[in-house]
């Protein structure tokens, strides 16, 4: 088939690589426009755009993909199907109608669970034991279209969102390729999503990533892992905003929620249940470091609290 691949961030790369090596022809890549990134705020292409250019594939970067001008441009490519992995924009019916076999999205959850922009983070924060990836035919409503296929993935007790997403990106790439094969062969029929079990995973704001120390230790552990690496779980300690990496549970210590206790080798923070031990932290404007090293340098006293 003639395919346009729509995607933007690094987790979309395994899928693009699989399709470039497949029996299908990737005639163009649709990705978000260049954005400013890094400390110098220099303009940078998306990871998907960079990979496409390495392979000599045309790159399309419309700021408004639903505008009539781009709808006409896509129609001129005479594509059979569009494959989508984390493109980053909602698509309107006029654009969805262009390819004769529609738009197929790879979503990193077992739909209808965790529709939306942050399914991996939501599954870890909720304490799910199993998640996966789903290919489905895109409809105007958010992540609601009929399903072509799924793969499952177990969530380990130490998984961060970054680690889990990395595995799903790889297994999902194989699912997307097999879905494209099945559609071309006429061997796949999309099945409507279940009515029950719908949950929503909206984009996470920086404020939502803040740690609420009154919660139980296990919930805080899941929250921190769900926010790692982006946007990063954070708190204020001694007047400094600090990102917090995955933690350990200090079952022999009881501290009031948010109370900080600096030990020789550990920094403990009280929760709604047992205390937790911080491992790595990143104070605002500084590099990642061991929590104990930071605490010594910051000279935290016995009265400090995490807020």
Swiss-Prot record:
Family (UniProt): Belongs to the Fmt family.
UniProt xrefs under HAMAP family: Formyl_trans (MF_00182)
Top-tier EC class: transferase
Keywords, ordered alphabetically: Protein biosynthesis, Transferase
Catalytic activity: L-methionyl-tRNA(fMet) + (6R)-10-formyltetrahydrofolate = N-formyl-L-methionyl-tRNA(fMet) + (6S)-5,6,7,8-tetrahydrofolate + H(+)
UniProt-listed PANTHER family: METHIONYL-TRNA FORMYLTRANSFERASE, METHIONYL-TRNA FORMYLTRANSFERASE, MITOCHONDRIAL
Entries under Pfam families matching the protein: Formyl_trans_C (PF02911), Formyl_trans_N (PF00551)
Binding site for (6S)-5,6,7,8-tetrahydrofolate: 109-112
GO terms of molecular function: methionyl-tRNA formyltransferase activity
Function in brief: Attaches a formyl group to the free amino group of methionyl-tRNA(fMet). The formyl group appears to play a dual role in the initiator identity of N-formylmethionyl-tRNA by promoting its recognition by IF2 and preventing the misappropriation of this tRNA by the elongation apparatus.
Entry EC no(s): 2.1.2.9
Name of the protein in question: Methionyl-tRNA formyltransferase
Keyword Protein biosynthesis: yes
NCBIfam families in UniProt: fmt
Organism encoding this protein: Mycobacteroides abscessus (strain ATCC 19977 / DSM 44196 / CCUG 20993 / CIP 104536 / JCM 13569 / NCTC 13031 / TMC 1543 / L948) (Mycobacterium abscessus)
């Amino acid at each position: 088939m003639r395919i346009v691949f729509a995607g933007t961030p690094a987790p979309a790369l395994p899928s693009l690589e699989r399709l470039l090596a497949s029996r299908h022809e990737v005639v163009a890549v649709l990705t978000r426009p260049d954005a400013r990134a890094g400390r110098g705020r220099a303009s940078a292409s998306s990871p998907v755009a960079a990979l496409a250019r390495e392979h000599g594939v045309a790159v399309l970067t419309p700021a408004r993909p639903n505008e009539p001008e781009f709808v006409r441009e896509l129609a001129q490519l005479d594509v059979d199907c569009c494959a989508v992995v984390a493109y980053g924009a909602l698509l309107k019916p006029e654009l969805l109608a262009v390819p004769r076999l529609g738009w197929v999205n790879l979503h990193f959850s077992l739909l209808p669970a965790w529709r939306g922009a942050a399914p991996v983070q939501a599954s870890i924060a909720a304490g799910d034991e199993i998640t996966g990836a789903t290919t489905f035919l895109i409809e105007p409503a958010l992540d609601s279209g009929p399903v072509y296929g799924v793969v499952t993935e177990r969530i380990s007790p130490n998984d961060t969102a970054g680690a889990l997403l990395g595995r799903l990106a790889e297994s999902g790439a194989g699912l997307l390729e097999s879905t494209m094969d099945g559609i071309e062969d006429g061997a796949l029929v999309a099945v409507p999503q279940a009515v029950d079990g719908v949950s929503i995973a909206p984009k996470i704001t920086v404020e939502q990533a803040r740690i609420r120390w009154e919660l139980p230790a296990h919930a805080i552990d899941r929250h921190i892992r769900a926010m790692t690496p982006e946007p990063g779980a954070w708190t204020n300690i001694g007047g400094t905003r600090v990102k917090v990496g995955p933690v350990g549970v200090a079952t022999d210590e009881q501290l009031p929620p948010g109370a900080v206790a600096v030990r020789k080798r550990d920094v403990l923070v009280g929760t709604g249940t047992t205390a937790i031990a911080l491992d790595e932290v990143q104070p605002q404007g500084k590099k990642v470091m061991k929590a104990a090293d930071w605490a010594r340098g910051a000279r935290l006293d016995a009265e400090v609290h995490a807020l």
